Curated annotation (Swiss-Prot):
The N-terminal domain determines nucleotide recognition and specific binding, while the C-terminal domain determines the specific binding to the target protein. It is an enzyme of class 2 (transferase). It holds the Pfam family NTP_transf_3. GTP binds at L12, A13, G14, K24, D71, D103. This is Probable molybdenum cofactor guanylyltransferase. InterPro entries: MobA-like_NTP_Trfase, Molybde_CF_guanTrfase, Nucleotide-diphossugar_trans. GO terms for molecular function: GTP binding; metal ion binding; molybdenum cofactor guanylyltransferase activity.
Length: 197
């Protein structure tokens, strides 16, 4: 566990993957991982316990060392899934959770360490990396934000930006932003494969 903080991990894997045209969770993973989901969970296991995977109803997933939580309704966006994950993490005793997307093939435990360090210093509700833009789905969230998310969702909000705007959020500028790379298209996937070759 990072800095002895009770830290859960939440992987958002239930997105529609419209630009990719197929489920990102089952795309080939880097560094020997069979799939992206297995890779991301493997990174989180190094710093987080427990780990929750937020998935779409009926979405086929590979076997991973994580608890799978299915969305009740498909296509609601990341905010409701994050809220459900934070609630599960709070019930498991975690004060913070690292929330990330499944499509992060360069994710590293060092990113989590940097976020935990700032959270420990500031007690912020949200700590998010910034590299010219904010990365909501590679951030640390306090688990007690689940109720605030419920209120935002009840009011019609679906974007993570709504939560950030309603929270005490701290940003950290990362010297190495490649850990934040994600894959949204087949071209992104090919570029990643070429970079690894």
């Amino acid at each position: 566990m990072a800095d002895s903080m009770q830290l859960a991990g939440i992987v958002l894997a239930g997105g529609e993957s419209r630009r990719m045209g197929r489920d990102k969770a089952t795309l080939p993973g880097p560094r020997g991982a069979a799939t992206l989901l297995e890779y991301v969970v493997g990174v989180l296991i190094q710093r987080c316990d427990p780990i929750f995977v937020m998935a779409a109803p009926g979405q086929p997933l590979p076997e991973v060392t994580a608890r799978i939580i299915r969305d009740e309704i498909r296509g609601q966006g990341p905010l409701p899934a994050t809220g459900r994950g934070l609630r599960a993490a709070a019930e498991a005793g975690a004060r913070y959770a690292f929330v990330c997307a499944v499509d992060m093939p360069l994710l590293s435990p060092e990113l989590i360490d940097d976020l935990v360090h700032l959270a420990t210093e500031t007690n912020a509700e949200v700590v998010l990396p910034w590299d010219g833009r904010s990365h909501y789905l590679a951030s640390l969230y306090r688990t007690d934000l689940a109720e605030r998310i419920d209120r935002l969702v009840a009011g019609g909000a679906r974007s993570m930006r709504a939560l950030i705007d309603a929270s005490d959020a701290q940003q950290i500028v990362l010297p190495e932003s490649r850990f934040l790379a994600n894959v949204n298209t087949e071209a992104d996937l090919r570029a990643l494969a070429q970079a690894r070759a």
